[in-house]
């Protein structure tokens, strides 16, 4: 349904809303960039690759007209854009405080409200304005996104998992570390329940770093806060597959992509994933098994499943669930466009520092000069 352009939709790109899940009293102390949310809000125009002509998109900056014209080759059609102030909170939080904005939309159309991440703010917006919302509910989204729950679900399904343990105290963390060392592990991944862009997942390269990290980790007295420590896999391949779970329990495999991961941070996507026919069949099978389990738990909507293929060729079918739209969800029309031309697609981010503003026209001109603009 997410890509059915015959259904009118309201798109809300609320990246950053998952910070509300974090309990700042536990885990490793983090330094938050106060301007990070402004950057997240600016990314909202990637939603345009999925929009239909009857859709409404909330943005914080009007896209370049030339950019809008250029992306029509990928299926974009002009839609209604509502420009909001770019503040240091998410678009969902802004709309919650300014619900009158949504009261002015055409009430004759049956819109589906689609947030990037379904939050309690989105639920309250839709409840107060009697709008249909995409997905299950905010509580279920939070539960499925919890990395500790992902590990528990995989154990319940008796599917392959990375060797590791759940820990709810410093003592249990130290014990788990020793058990992994006894098994021959010397590098580790330590994960908190929630993370975004690599925050909350930590690569531990040696015992000295582990000892320092164990001292920094803050646990709750009632042992309700859990983390995991797992073997760090070298020479792995990171595969993401997206499934959509309908209200009647149908599970559709949307796409399989290969991820570019720098240590713990997502940097980009390769499409199609470089998989054998046997591996594709295995992912199709795992999509159904995991999708049915998530449906039984009460989840509806899109979920991205991060997986690995280890150096022995064994598929670890899920290391975490992204119970939301994924970054690569928005790029699917681009990737499919080039796949039809028998081209592989690499989509990734680069950090660029400039002395002057780098707008779309200037970027396009530079790409043309290098003969890499399509």
List where the protein language model places each region:
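Conserved ATP-binding module of the ATP-grasp superfamily
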Residues: 160-162, 183-189, 205-234
């Amino acid at each position: 349904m997410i890509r059915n352009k015959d259904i009118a939709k309201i798109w809300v790109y609320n990246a950053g809303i998952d910070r509300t899940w974090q309990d700042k009293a536990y885990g490793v102390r983090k330094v938050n960039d106060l301007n990070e949310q402004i950057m997240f809000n600016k990314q909202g125009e990637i939603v345009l690759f999925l929009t239909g002509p009857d859709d409404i998109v909330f943005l914080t900056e009007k896209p370049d007209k030339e950019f809008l014209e250029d992306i029509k080759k990928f299926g974009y059609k002009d839609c209604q854009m509502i420009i909001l102030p770019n503040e240091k909170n998410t678009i969902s939080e802004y709309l919650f405080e300014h619900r009158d904005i949504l009261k002015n939309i055409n009430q004759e159309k049956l819109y589906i409200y689609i947030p990037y991440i379904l939050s309690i703010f989105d639920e309250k917006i839709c409840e107060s304005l009697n709008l249909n919302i995409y997905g299950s509910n905010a509580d279920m989204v939070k539960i499925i996104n919890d990395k500790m729950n992902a590990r528990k679900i995989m154990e319940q399904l008796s599917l392959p998992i990375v060797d590791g343990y759940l820990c709810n105290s410093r003592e249990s963390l130290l014990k788990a570390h020793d058990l992994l060392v006894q098994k021959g592990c010397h590098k580790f991944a330590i994960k908190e329940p929630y993370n975004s862009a690599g925050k909350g997942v930590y690569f531990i390269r040696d015992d000295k770093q582990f000892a320092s990290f164990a001292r920094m980790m803050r646990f709750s007295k009632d042992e309700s806060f859990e983390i995991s420590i797992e073997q760090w896999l070298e020479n792995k391949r990171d595969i993401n597959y997206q499934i959509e779970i309908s209200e009647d329990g149908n599970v559709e495999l949307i796409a399989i992509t290969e991820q570019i991961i720098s240590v713990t941070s997502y940097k980009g996507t390769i499409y199609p994933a470089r998989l054998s026919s046997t591996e594709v069949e295995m992912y199709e099978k795992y999509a159904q098994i995991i999708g049915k389990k998530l449906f039984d738990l009460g989840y509806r909507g899109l979920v991205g499943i991060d997986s690995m293929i280890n150096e022995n060729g064994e598929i670890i079918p899920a290391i975490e669930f992204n119970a939301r739209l994924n970054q690569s969800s928005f790029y699917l029309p681009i990737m499919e466009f080039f796949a039809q031309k028998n081209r592989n697609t690499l989509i990734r981010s680069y950090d660029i520092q400039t002395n002057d503003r780098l707008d779309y026209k200037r970027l396009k001109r530079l790409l043309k000069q290098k003969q890499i603009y399509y």
